[in-house]
Each structure stands twice: as C-alpha cells, then as structure tokens.
Amino acid sequence: MTELELLGPRASGDALGTAVLKAVAEDFQVDEVLDIPLSGQGEHLWLWVEKRDLNTEEAARRLARAAGVPARSISYAGLKDRQALTRQWFSLHLPGKADPDLSRAEDETLRVLKQVRHQRKLQRGAHSANGFTLRLTGLQADHPALDARLEQLKQQGVPNYFGAQRFGHAGGNVHDALDWATRQALPEQRNVRSRLLSAARSYLFNQVLAARVADGSWQHAQVGDLLAFTDSRSFFAAGEAECSDPRLAILDLHPTGPLWGEGPAPGGGTPQALETEVGARHPQLCQWLARAGMDHERRILRLPIGRLTWHYPEPDILQLEFVLPAGCFATVVVRELVDLVPAGQTDSPCVF
C-alpha cells in the first residue's frame, strides 16, 4: 500500500521540494510533556530517561531488569519513535525498596537523567503533549515558499492523519489486520494484537479524514458532526449554532472522526453518512474491532501545531520546533511541506 492509500491527500497543496529526515537520531528529537507535580515520596520511582535509537518497550525491559523487578512493575505514558533522540518518563513500582542502581541499564543508547519518588504509578496516556525538534537535511526547496507554507500551517493546522509508521512497511500491519479480520480471530500475543487492532482503527479513521480533506470539509464543522476540544476526549453534537462557534476559527474546537468500535457510528447528517459509507467498504474490519471489545471513540480531524518556529541553520537544512497533543504524528506536519527521500548521513550539527 502506498502512503497516499494509507493516509490521504495533502491539504496545503503539492510538496514544495524534498528533504531527508532522520539521517541521524538528533534530527528527530522528542520531549514528553507531563503536567503532573511529583511529590518526592512514595513507592513509585519516576525516571526521566533519554533514549537514542531505542524503542520504548526495550528501554522499559532494560530498566526493569536493572532494578530487579518484573516487567509488569514498570510503566510509561506512551510509545516513542525508535529512530530518534527521545526523552520520556517511566515509573518503577518499588514498595518497601530503596532506589536501585540503574547504571547497568545505561549505555550510549539510554541515560537516566532524573529520578523522583511519587505516590502513584505513571498511567498510559498521562502525558499531555510531545515537544518536537526536527531537522530536515539535504533540503531542496525554495525558502520563501516554505516560509509561506509554514505560516499557513500555523494558522490552519494540518489533517490529523495517523502517520505511515503506524501501518508498518508498505502497510503490512493493515494487511495482517485484514487477514485476522477475515477469520474473525485475534492474535494470542498481546503486543501483536494491540498493534494490529490499532492499525485497523487508524486506517479506517484515515479513510474518513481523507474524504473530508478531498472535499475541503476537514476543518469546518457540519451539522451532525461530533465536536471536541483539542485536549478533550469528550465530544458533543453540532447543530446550526455550533457550526459557527468562534472557537472553531481559533483551532480550539474541531470536528472529529471515528475510532471504530462496538456500536453504530454516532452523530448524524452528512458526517455520519460518510462514516457509514467507509464502514460499509470495510465490514470485516469494523466487525473485527467490535468483537475485540473496542469502544467507539473519537479523534479530532484537525491538528493544531503549538509553538511552531523554524529557521535555516544552513541553506540546505530546515529546523522545526513545535508541540503536538499526545497521540499525534510529527511526520504529518512534515508531509505538508516536502517529500522525504531516503536518509544519508550529514555532518551539520543540530542548532538549538
């Protein structure tokens, strides 16, 4: 499957050129934003960890092993990219135990930067946002055109697609999900089951969003839409009055799309008709998600880009800094700017 099939059309026009992303880990930096005051006491040890070219699950296993606790005793808020330099929180459950020596977990790929005690463990999804510093190298694009496009993105946001990495190489996760859905069976391995269910839901959401990008309605509320605020999981139906809510214009309130699960798609009008049509094209996936016990949830169609700044450390390098809500993909921002080409090493440092 191609990227266009997995995501959908761009909203801002054709790519303005080409660039390389992730030539080195420092080109893709992620800092988890967690708005939780830590007390300094309790049976949970929270760890602020820097990872380089290491996925979150492997980092968790190494930290648990070094602490001498089972893997179920370590928690994290969210998964971060492997091919990146990332900083995120973990928590270890250590009732009645002293702080362990975690140096055995550390090497050039993992460093523990801070340790703080707290009364509660870190819950999945507890982070409010992620801060990104991206360096696009080998840039071949007109700077004034990029500047104008970035100003446009700052004002209108981007389609909140699930990024291509959610679907595996060439959409392999979607193909695997379709295979299981055809048999209406679930993988026994929990991590495989979670990955494929997530890929299926993400693919269906992207199909709905792609249709609304194509007809221009992705950033406009329609009667029957279910609206949600940027940082809220609750939603409400849009009537005529809600469609002109001024908070839509300032990127605070957004139309949403479906994260498929049990029960009919809520909402009404044209939006519901579209979602029903997408579901009818993929009945086995929808039935599979419902039978797996997934609840029907919503995700905003429009992604506001917080604190967006950019500069050019060199003529062929564009550095971007911005903040996105948890669960959103930095690569869909880049996609509205340039086409990415395969990585090749660069020697230029990342300037902050």
From Swiss-Prot:
Catalyzed reaction equations: uridine(13) in tRNA = pseudouridine(13) in tRNA
Keywords associated with the record: Isomerase, tRNA processing
Keyword Isomerase: yes
UniProt-listed GO biological process terms: tRNA pseudouridine synthesis
One Pfam family per UniProt: TruD
Gene Ontology CC terms: cytosol
TRUD domain boundaries: 157-303
EC class: isomerase
Family recorded in the similarity comment: Belongs to the pseudouridine synthase TruD family.
Name of this protein: tRNA pseudouridine synthase D
